[in-house]
Amino acid sequence: MEDNAFTGAYSYNLDEKGRLMLPARLRVALSDTRLVLTCAIESCLWVFPRAQWDRFSSQISARASLFHAPSRAVLRRLIAPAQEVELDRAWRLFIPPSLREYAALEKDCLILGLSHCLEIWDRARYRAYLAESEADFRAGTETLQDLCL
């Protein structure tokens, strides 16, 4: 994903083995089939290409202190649960059971492209999140008011 960015929203079903098909439009943004999955902040999963994860986790580790309780919480919730997986020949992403449980992934999933990473949501949980986060979205757009569009 060096030059290309992840974008779009894609509905896919998790198969009985815990695998999720990676959409063709997202595959072109990958330069490597190794991906790192971890718990995200809003009860979903983040998916990073391996090189992007290395940069992201290094930045977190460089700023975190084991003597600072909030830093330990970030390390425990973002770094510790991270697992590397390799896409199979059919471009399926295996989601380990512990991560499926964290994000409540059973069947109906949504894959979101967030430019530098992907999010994987349970579809119903994402709809609920959208309803709950409208005020945050509006506040966030106000921080972008200096953009020239």
UniProtKB/Swiss-Prot annotation:
Superkingdom of origin organism: Bacteria
Matches recorded under InterPro entries: MraZ (IPR003444), MraZ_C (IPR035644), MraZ_dom (IPR020603), MraZ_N (IPR035642), MraZ_sf (IPR038619), SpoVT-AbrB_dom (IPR007159), SpoVT-AbrB_sf (IPR037914)
Pfam families: MraZ
Biological processes annotated in GO: negative regulation of DNA-templated transcription initiation
Keyword check for Thylakoid: no
Bilayer-spanning residue ranges: none
Alphabetical UniProt keywords: Cytoplasm, DNA-binding, Repeat, Transcription, Transcription regulation
Subcellular location: Cytoplasm, Nucleoid
Any one Gene Ontology cellular component term annotated for this protein: cytoplasm
Gene3D superfamilies: Transcriptional regulator MraZ domain (3.40.1550.20)
Gene Ontology MF, one: DNA-binding transcription factor activity
Domain SpoVT-AbrB: residue ranges: 9-52, 82-125
Family the UniProt entry places it in: Belongs to the MraZ family.
Assembly description: Forms oligomers.
NCBIfam families, A to Z: division/cell wall cluster transcriptional repressor MraZ (TIGR00242)
Record's protein name: Transcriptional regulator MraZ
Organism of provenance: Treponema pallidum (strain Nichols)
